[in-house]
Amino acid sequence: MKKVFFKTFGCRTNISDTGVMMQNLKDFELTANESEADIIVVNSCTVTNGADTGVRSYVNSASKLGAKVIIAGCGAFSKGEELFAKNKVFGVFGHSEKEHINTLLKSEERFVQMGDLTSLDDTIVSDYAGKTKAFIKIQEGCDFRCNYCIIPFVRGDARSQDESKIIEQIEKLALNGYGEFVLTGTNIGSYGKDKGTSLGKLVQKIGALKGVRRVRLGSIEPVQIDESFREILAEPWLERHLHIALQHTSQKMLAIMKRRNHVKRDLELFQELSSKGFALGTDFITGHPGESEAIWDEAYASLEQFPLTHIHAFTYSKRDGTPSATMSEQVKGDVAKQRLKMIESLVEHKNIAFRQAHHLPLEVLIEEGKEGLYSGYDQYYNKVTIQTSRDILKEWVRVDDYDIRMEANYAKF
């Protein structure tokens, strides 16, 4: 039986997609060692140039191992055919084809099978190999058309998974011992708009299921937080961390980016959620075309007011085919990187201030560790490192006594 190795790049949605592919692999053996694989499936990301570079570099190194290299994921749409034409990969397939992976990998002929951008998966994933938490894809695609973003062109328009299928998958995973569920998708806040329901209503039902200990949400847009979502904020099973995508804190830049959020309303929302004890994360792009010194100064001064604890910040990456790619007022790379460092430093200090102000008992799911040193994430999505002689891998641990350090909270018992 031929052995298959999966290499997953990018977001939590890709982790979920890899789970779907593994679940449908019936006539092959999975391996965790790429050097012994007959076939290497690269579930790729294309959100930035850096992501493309990482995938391309891995494909080059993987091809030297003698295995057939197959590219899937978002990069299949942006770079797949180019890699195929250069004989860098044996095959390419799109999102809608991943449930046919068992047949595709049997092909003796090189192939490109892109499929469509309208389908949803039917597979119920019952296990995530090597993972302590389960990733539940509740929707696919995005109806937003932000000027810098290529993702709608490689994931399609927003479409919601059937609620019954989501519930069934979580129930099966809970029976298999999973207690933390991470809801993923391209734009999860759009869940239900095509089905007459909402994200808040779905999450309320998930939280009521037997075995669900913690629900973590992927990124949400500020405009998607409605009353049904506010109704779940006090629920004990909801992670006390929310990731709300701002992308920028200058109103002028938001207009240039064609974003739907508004700085003043965003700040009010963040202050409301912070007052309820939530840790708050966001995305931020520095160096987007048009980000003048005046706009940057305005944005930084505004960002200082936000009660943030986490940030996923990155410099602007030109994506061919997007409106931003043709904008003339480019920002120098070194300037964008310096601005990136500024906001990362700002939020790093905000994070430790939050932890000092919320020195409360922590509930930690231990995700990795060995030889007496373990780590996991608490209900605020902060890393906790634990030194102990006990084997606590994959356990839920309550931590009352701990030190607050810049890089993580630290406990010993």
Language model features with spans:
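Residue-level signal for inorganic ion chemistry
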Residues: 41, 74, 101, 183, ...
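Terminal RNA-binding accessory module
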Residues: 326-413
